[in-house]
């Protein structure tokens, strides 16, 4: 799909989702990365700068450059912007749960994501706004997000854009160059990057997922793209094993009902 057409669809989606709800504004967690920057830009175009609140939530290991880039986005868009350091909140958790000192980087990182989600909803509830998701299609398919953390949102405006498409649209909308050029990172621990964590680049991930979702087999994708079968299998294993992250919690129905009770 043409990237301009995709942008128009997303902007219409944002407006339609809020229409008739009595809610006019949005809260966006602006990390300093490309996904949240794009969501902020799209939200402003859909709702107006006066109706978008950006919140940056660093902690002790957050690079200064992330705070600077998040601030650039807010300044460029003219939106209200808050910086809330979550280091003290993390320390309260660590004091209350002594076992947390032995937690892996992933476990600790997931806690940070869930604290941030709670803060976004606090402000959304306070001002009667929605929490905008910043997940892209590549991450959502791979399950590369924290359940009830950065995955805990009201709507996902860029959830049907692959990471490579996010970059293309961000460049078109004028997202700052420092954000476009940096290595993608969830910022869950010091020095973390998405592609080191995943073991494969987003370019490869997207090249594999697009034909697979269009119905092509793994062998054909391997021969056509030259991507090793091990990488293709690894990507698809992530997609399958993280299905639970893309669905709502399952209910143990006591009869044959399999949808909503009122549907």
Swiss-Prot record:
CDD domains: NAD_synthase
A matching Pfam family: NAD_synthase
Pathway assignment: Cofactor biosynthesis; NAD(+) biosynthesis; NAD(+) from deamido-NAD(+) (ammonia route): step 1/1
Group of enzyme by EC: ligase
Residues reported in the UniProt entry to bind Mg(2+): 35, 139
Catalytic activity: deamido-NAD(+) + NH4(+) + ATP = AMP + diphosphate + NAD(+) + H(+)
GO molecular function: ATP binding; glutaminase activity; metal ion binding; NAD+ synthase (glutamine-hydrolyzing) activity; NAD+ synthase activity
UniProt KW Metal-binding keyword: yes
Highest rank taxon of the organism: Archaea
Binding site for ATP: 29-36, 134, 163, 185
GO biological process: NAD biosynthetic process
Record-linked SUPFAM superfamilies: Adenine nucleotide alpha hydrolases-like
Function description: Catalyzes the ATP-dependent amidation of deamido-NAD to form NAD. Uses ammonia as a nitrogen source.
Subunit structure: Homodimer.
Protein family: Belongs to the NAD synthetase family.
HAMAP family recorded: NadE_ammonia_dep
Protein name per the record: NH(3)-dependent NAD(+) synthetase
Taxonomic source organism: Methanococcoides burtonii (strain DSM 6242 / NBRC 107633 / OCM 468 / ACE-M)
Lineage: Archaea, Methanobacteriati, Methanobacteriota, Stenosarchaea group, Methanomicrobia
């Amino acid at each position: 799909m043409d990237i301009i057409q995709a942008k128009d669809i997303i902007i219409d989606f944002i407006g339609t989702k809020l229409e008739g709800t009595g809610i006019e504004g949005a809260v966006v967690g602006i990390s300093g990365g490309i996904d949240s920057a794009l969501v902020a830009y799209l939200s402003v175009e859909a709702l107006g700068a006066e109706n978008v609140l950006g919140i940056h939530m660093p902690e002790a290991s957050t690079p200064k450059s992330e705070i600077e880039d998040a601030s650039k986005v807010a300044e460029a868009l003219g939106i209200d912007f808050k910086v809330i350091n979550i280091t003290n909140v993390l320390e309260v958790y660590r004091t209350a749960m002594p076992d947390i000192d032995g937690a892996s980087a992933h476990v600790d990182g997931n806690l940070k994501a869930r604290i941030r989600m709670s803060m976004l909803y606090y402000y959304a509830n306070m001002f009667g706004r929605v929490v905008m998701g910043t997940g892209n299609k590549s991450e959502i398919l791979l399950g590369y997000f924290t359940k009830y953390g950065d995955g805990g949102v009201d709507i996902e405006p860029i959830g049907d854009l692959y990471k490579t498409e996010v970059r293309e649209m961000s460049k078109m909308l004028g997202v700052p160059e420092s954000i476009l050029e940096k290595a993608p990172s969830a910022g869950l621990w010091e020095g973390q990057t998405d592609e080191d964590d995943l073991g494969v680049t987003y370019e490869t991930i997207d090249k594999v997922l697009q034909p697979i979702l269009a119905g092509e087999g793994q062998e054909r994708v391997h021969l056509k793209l030259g991507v090793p079968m091990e990488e293709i299998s690894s990507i698809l294993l992530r997609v399958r094993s993280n299905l639970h992250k893309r669905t709502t919690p399952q209910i143990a129905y006591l009869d044959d009902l399999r949808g909503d009770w009122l549907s």
